[in-house]
Amino acid sequence: MKAQNVRDLDEHELKTKLKEMDEQMFRLHFQMSMGQMDGLKKVRQMRKDRARMNTILRERELAGEKK
């Protein structure tokens, strides 16, 4: 997910997507531990997307404090 697409979402949508990603990450890690999935690419991309969302949420939080 591109940063601009993430910035277009409101705070509630971002938090909802983060919860969904957490659940997906848990399932993917479980599948990897069971040997059902080999590729790390999807896990890495999800981790980067999650970090991007957290960063944008934090930016908004800090911008709100400055005002």
Curated annotation (Swiss-Prot):
One of its GO terms (molecular function) is structural constituent of ribosome. One of its GO terms (biological process) is translation. The keyword Metal-binding does not apply. Keywords: Ribonucleoprotein, Ribosomal protein. Transmembrane segments: none annotated. GO terms for cellular component: ribonucleoprotein complex; ribosome. The keyword Ribosomal protein applies. SUPFAM superfamilies: Ribosomal protein L29 (L29p) (SSF46561). Belongs to the universal ribosomal protein uL29 family. NCBIfam families: L29. This is Large ribosomal subunit protein uL29. The gene is rpmC.
